[in-house]
Design a protein with these regions (language model features):
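Transmembrane alpha-helix interface/packing and boundary motifs in multi-pass membrane proteins
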Residues: 64-75, 209-214, 286-294, 327-336, ...
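Helix-loop-helix hairpins and the membrane-proximal interhelical loops
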Residues: 1-50, 185-186, 223-320
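Transmembrane helix-loop junctions in multipass membrane proteins, especially transporters and channels
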Residues: 19, 72-76, 124-125, 159, ...
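Intrinsically disordered, low-complexity cytosolic terminal tails
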Residues: 478-535
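Helix-loop-helix junctions within the multi-pass membrane cores of secondary transporters/permeases
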Residues: 1-10, 31-39, 54, 59-60, ...
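Alpha-helical membrane-protein architecture signal
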Residues: 202, 281-285, 317, 321-328, ...
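Membrane-embedded alpha-helical modules
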Residues: 93-225, 362-496
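Conformational gate/switch positions in structured elements
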Residues: 75-77, 218, 295, 338, ...
Length: 535
């Protein structure tokens, strides 16, 4: 239950963000304000939002339950934060103004899931995750955190604190929608939006205080409080104004408990890529790369938290099945209309309460299943209730910046470019491209100068550079494939013996080696080592 309450916010946040793309609703190309005042289009978008509530809860329930049943891990999965924003605001674009239509974007997600599955089976997934420099991997999470923060501060899916400007790319906003002029706020009306202040104090300050005192479900408490304040109709902060759109939303909200079938986003994929090949490829590669890093990093950290990491291979039991469940869930989610799913760090809430097995995930999945029938509630959560949630999630993601190697410019500059370009271009892909290319360029120049000068031109602090290698401890191929190559008939089963003959030989001290017992400096008595059993 702790895991569910820690991440239940994803149902409303993901539906709010994804529906801003417009889904498969059609906005006329000549519409002057991108259909922001088109009632028929906005009612269609509201239907997309309701579909997304059902789809998000359903795919989270399915993926999380099978993560526990098949992989026996206490990890929950749901549509990933960051990837859903990239999907909605860059790939599809606000109200469909992006690179490719919604239906083709779903096709990219569907294909990415199956490719991810193939990479997992062949062991390439692990290699790709480790082949990227550590600074770029850490910077990716930080950049996505700032990206989410910017979305949470904007109008479309946030509190409306910032907006576009004429003389600068962005400026302070905070006026009501009725007072906005061409997307900008007049100077006399800034910071006067009541919904913004409700979102800041009840959804931001209160939630941060609850998190400060480790209150379980702090995020969902803040979201629900702002929503409850915004539900009464005759108020300045109501989410249900007396308009045709507001009346339709209020009528659905009054049902409270009902099953809303997925109508518009189910099986909405389009396989005709004519005219969209390059954009499709960029979206596909970005989804795949971010999903590999996100899922690998989260599963690794949760497994380490649960104490199941093998220090030699840096892998954990059930890893292959966990990645396969995640990959298949990505493709199933595309059939329902959702962005790619990923493992959630909020799973740590359940682990900290004692959850160490898949039973924790099974219970969390069942809770998401129950949430499917509360679609009217989750579909009626306003964007200013979730805006500060995005800011807080961004803050949590940015703590990885402390682990970046800022001492060596060959690591620091590419990491900074990755972080900065993601929010400034509203694109995860462009940030990754800038970071990877700059890393290759800088370190290639250093290598050429060092080789050409025969070791005389070397950066003074090159010894502080993060180590990098394409080799993987434990071998390139996954354990199940190695067992198959060895001729093991039940290759899908883990080896029973803890140490193989080769591993034991590697663990024995060799001639000329000095073995230092680290327990000398500890307070614990030294235990005698067990002798190796004779053959």
């Amino acid at each position: 239950m702790a895991t569910f309450f820690a991440m239940a916010y994803i149902i409303s946040v993901n539906s709010n963000i994804t529906s801003k793309s417009g889904g498969n609703c059609v906005c006329p190309a000549d519409d002057p304000d991108h259909c922001n005042s088109n009632t028929d289009y906005l009612m269609c978008v509201q239907e997309i939002n309701r579909d997304m509530v059902t789809a998000t809860a359903a795919i989270s329930a399915l993926g999380t339950f099978f993560m526990g049943l098949l992989a026996n891990l206490p990890v929950a999965i749901a549509p990933g934060m960051g990837l859903n924003a990239y999907f909605a605001y860059t790939v599809v674009g606000y109200h469909g103004q992006g690179m490719i239509p919604y239906s083709i974007a779903l096709t990219a997600v569907f294909v990415e899931g199956w490719v991810f599955l193939g990479l997992t089976l062949l062991g390439i997934r692990q290699w790709l995750a480790r082949a990227l420099p550590a600074s770029i991997k850490l910077a990716t999470g930080v950049g996505i955190g700032l990206y989410l923060t910017l979305i949470g501060l904007s109008y479309s899916a946030g509190i409306g604190l910032v907006a576009g400007a004429q003389d600068t790319p962005m400026e302070l906003a905070g006026c009501t929608d009725a007072l906005r002029q061409e997307g900008m706020c007049p100077s006399a009306d800034k910071m006067r939006s009541p919904t913004m202040w409700v979102g800041i104090f009840c959804g931001g300050v209160l939630t941060a205080c609850l998190m400060l005192y480790r209150v379980k479900g702090a995020v969902i408490i803040g979201i629900l409080l702002v929503s409850i304040i915004s539900w009464p109709r005759p108020t300045a902060v109501t989410y249900f104004p007396h308009t045709p759109l507001g009346d339709d939303m209020f009528d659905f909200f009054k049902q409270v408990v009902t099953f809303h079938p997925i109508k518009r986003t189910l099986l909405a994929m389009e396989w005709d890529l004519a005219g969209h090949g390059a954009e499709f490829g960029l979206a596909f590669i970005t989804f795949l790369y971010v999903d590999i890093l996100d899922t690998t990093g989260t599963l690794y950290s949760m497994a380490k938290f649960a104490g199941t990491i093998d220090e030699r291979t840096q892998d954990f039991e059930g890893s292959a099945m966990a990645y396969m469940v995640d990959a298949i869930t990505i493709s199933i989610g595309a059939l329902l209309g959702t962005p790619p799913v990923a493992a959630f760090v909020e799973s740590g809430a359940g682990i900290s309460e004692g959850g160490r097995t898949g039973l924790t995930s099974c219970v969390t999945g069942f809770c998401f299943f129950i949430a499917v029938f509360f679609a009217p509630i989750f579909a009626s959560i306003p964007p200013w209730a979730t805006g500060c949630t995005l800011v807080l999630v961004g803050a949590l993601m940015c703590k990885a910046a402390a682990e970046i190697n800022w001492r060596y410019y060959g690591d620091a500059v590419p990491a900074f470019l990755t972080i900065a370009i993601m929010p400034f271009t509203y694109s995860i892909a462009y940030g990754l491209i800038a970071g990877i290319l700059s890393y290759m360029l800088l370190n290639m120049i250093v290598w050429v100068l060092e080789v050409g000068s025969r070791g005389r031109l070397v950066p003074p602090n090159k010894h502080e550079k993060d180590p990098w290698t394409w080799r993987i401890a434990g071998g390139f191929f996954p354990p199940w494939l190695q067992r198959l190559f060895r001729g093991k008939k039940d290759f899908w089963r883990e080896d029973q013996s803890q140490l193989t003959e080769d591993e034991w030989r590697d663990s024995e001290p060799r001639l000329g080696e000095v073995v230092v017992d680290e327990s000398i400096n500890s307070q614990e008595p030294v235990q005698e080592k067990a002798e190796h059993p004779k053959a």
